[in-house]
Structures are given as structure tokens and as C-alpha cells.
Amino acid sequence: MATVTHTAALARLGHALSDATRSGVLLALREAPAFPSDLADALGVTRQAMSNHLACLRGCGLVEAVPDGRRTWYRLADAHLSYALDELLRVVLYVEPDCCDGEGCTC
């Protein structure tokens, strides 16, 4: 049986994934750590918007900020998140196989 802690953890993940930009950040960080400006450019959002999304993801415990001199880069908070995102994508594509084709994804 799920505990309140399990429920809260899944709710935090659901909140993080409920926004396309935050989902994009998680998928990008699954590949490699990145600076906020690079994430903003890659996802087509302002740096201020990216800052807000990263703050949300930090608050959810999904990403970590790593100081690097005068700059800060971000990474997934735990390597298990990378595997979880991979599995979640597999499930989505299994349940809705027609959402992605050679021209992109609609899901």
C-alpha cells in the first residue's frame, strides 16, 4: 500500500512533468549537465523563465545546482531519475505508439 510519502513523491514528479519546459529540462539533463542559459536557448524560453522552472525542479528535489566559479550548472539530483525517465518514455510510447513518428511526437 502506498504511504503518504510515496503519494507526495509521485505528486512532486507529476507536478514537475506537467509543464513541457520542465519535462524538456529533465530530458536534457538526462543526457548531460547544463548551464541554465544553454537550457533556455535549447528549449526556446527566456533565461528568467528557465530560472523559474529550475527553481521548481529544485524544490521538487529532481535537479541540483552545482556552483562552478561565477556560474552554476544543473544536473539530475540522482542517476535513478535518468532510468525512471527512460522507463516512463517507454511506457508512454507503449500505451500510445502512434504519438511519435519520423516527424516528431504529438504526445
PLM features per residue range, with description:
Residues 58-68, 75:
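Beta-hairpin "wing" of winged helix-turn-helix
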Residues 53:
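Residues within the DNA-recognition helix of helix-turn-helix
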Residues 33-34, 58, 89:
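Residue-level detector of secondary-structure transition/capping positions
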Residues 2, 8-46, 71-81:
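N-terminal helix-turn-helix DNA-binding core of bacterial DNA-binding proteins
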Residues 1-9, 79-107:
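Amphipathic alpha-helical dimerization/coiled-coil segments
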Residues 37, 41, 56, 60, ...:
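Functionally engaged cysteine thiol sites
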